[in-house]
């Protein structure tokens, strides 16, 4: 059996560009793509923390080191500059890989979309 699992996440990145008339996609700083293990043309889901919008598109390379998160085409209507978004990619993982210790790549960024940390799991949520 295979399970649809979180593979990659860029957490709380700020939208830097909204390009309505650019061919659809999301341009992401190449440093962030590599850190999160997202490849060009891979399907991504984007969740807007500010307004609750959730949508899918595909990733393209943004200028390395720029902090770019550019929503292009119709995706540009789903956010405003400065909105915080979570960018996620999923993969089908078989039971053997899961039992062998497969883990996702989670990337956390600062207010300039520079990497401030990473980890391979989502912590257990507690009632506090």
UniProtKB/Swiss-Prot annotation:
<dbReference type="GO" id="GO:0006523">
    <property type="term" value="P:alanine biosynthetic process"/>
</dbReference>
<keyword id="KW-0456">Lyase</keyword>
<protein>
    <recommendedName>
        <fullName>Aspartate 1-decarboxylase</fullName>
        <ecNumber>4.1.1.11</ecNumber>
    </recommendedName>
</protein>
<dbReference type="InterPro" id="IPR009010">
    <property type="entry name" value="Asp_de-COase-like_dom_sf"/>
</dbReference>
<comment type="similarity">
    <text>Belongs to the PanD family.</text>
</comment>
<comment type="function">
    <text>Catalyzes the pyruvoyl-dependent decarboxylation of aspartate to produce beta-alanine.</text>
</comment>
<comment type="pathway">
    <text>Cofactor biosynthesis; (R)-pantothenate biosynthesis; beta-alanine from L-aspartate: step 1/1.</text>
</comment>
<keyword id="KW-0068">Autocatalytic cleavage</keyword>
<feature type="modified residue" description="Pyruvic acid (Ser)">
    <location>
        <position position="25"/>
    </location>
</feature>
<feature type="binding site">
    <location>
        <position position="57"/>
    </location>
    <ligand>
        <name>substrate</name>
    </ligand>
</feature>
<keyword id="KW-0865">Zymogen</keyword>
<feature type="active site" description="Schiff-base intermediate with substrate; via pyruvic acid">
    <location>
        <position position="25"/>
    </location>
</feature>
<dbReference type="InterPro" id="IPR003190">
    <property type="entry name" value="Asp_decarbox"/>
</dbReference>
<dbReference type="GO" id="GO:0004068">
    <property type="term" value="F:aspartate 1-decarboxylase activity"/>
</dbReference>
<dbReference type="Pfam" id="PF02261">
    <property type="entry name" value="Asp_decarbox"/>
</dbReference>
<feature type="binding site">
    <location>
        <begin position="73"/>
        <end position="75"/>
    </location>
    <ligand>
        <name>substrate</name>
    </ligand>
</feature>
<keyword id="KW-0704">Schiff base</keyword>
<dbReference type="GO" id="GO:0015940">
    <property type="term" value="P:pantothenate biosynthetic process"/>
</dbReference>
<keyword id="KW-0963">Cytoplasm</keyword>
<keyword id="KW-0210">Decarboxylase</keyword>
<keyword id="KW-0670">Pyruvate</keyword>
<feature type="active site" description="Proton donor">
    <location>
        <position position="58"/>
    </location>
</feature>
<keyword id="KW-0566">Pantothenate biosynthesis</keyword>
<comment type="subunit">
    <text>Heterooctamer of four alpha and four beta subunits.</text>
</comment>
<dbReference type="GO" id="GO:0005829">
    <property type="term" value="C:cytosol"/>
</dbReference>
């Amino acid at each position: 059996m295979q399970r649809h699992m979180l593979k990659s996440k860029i957490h709380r990145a700020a939208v830097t560009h909204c390009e309505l008339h650019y061919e659809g996609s999301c341009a992401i700083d190449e440093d962030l793509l590599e850190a999160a293990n997202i490849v060009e043309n891979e399907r991504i889901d984007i969740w807007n923390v500010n307004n609750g919008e959730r949508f899918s598109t595909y990733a393209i390379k943004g200028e390395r080191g720029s902090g770019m998160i550019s929503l292009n085409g119709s995706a540009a209507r789903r956010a405003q500059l400065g909105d915080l978004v979570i960018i996620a990619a999923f993969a089908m993982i078989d039971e053997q890989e899961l039992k062998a210790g497969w883990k996702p790549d989670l990337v956390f960024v600062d207010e300039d979309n520079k990497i401030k940390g990473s980890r391979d799991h989502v912590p257990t949520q507690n009632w506090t």
